[in-house]
Amino acid sequence: LEVPSEQADLGIEVILKLFSREGLSPLTPKGGTSNLSDNAKRIVALWDEYLKTIDSVIAFLQGKNPTLALQICQEDYLPEASRFAQLEELDWAFGTMGTQDKAKHLATLYLEDISDFIVECVDENFGFSRYAERLGRSANSFDELYEALQKEPTYIDGILLSILEEKIARIQPELMLISVPFP
């Protein structure tokens, strides 16, 4: 057909934008924390450390800085909230597997801590995969999904929309196809 085409995974692009110093900075907690869980309060207390480490951790997970594994495996590099509670068994689990695997595991716990904070304080529908999946899966009708679409866009929706707008402006497509991951 000789139709020029481009493909983009906006889900990955949103995660990479959100999980960056630039993406997390606007979420810097302001005001009181009395209505937050103990876990969220801990993350708030360590927020500056999350901002200092997020870009390097993402680069490590993308394979761009494998030497960071040694630092990540040191107890004082990553800020730690509730996802790190089960670390007693870490040496047993990773003792023979090596530093890279252990660092990837710790970096994943770190991202999951941030994700827990985002779900509690920013966007209850956030998740690393199948964002807002609950809306599509549990619906007997489209009423709940329709109501969700009528709400103001969340911070994460804003990231998605800005990436989409940039792509449309750059590519100027005549036709656009979108895959929607709802069952």
Show which residues each predicted segment covers.
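A short, structured N-terminal alpha-helical element that caps or precedes a catalytic domain
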Residues: L1-P183
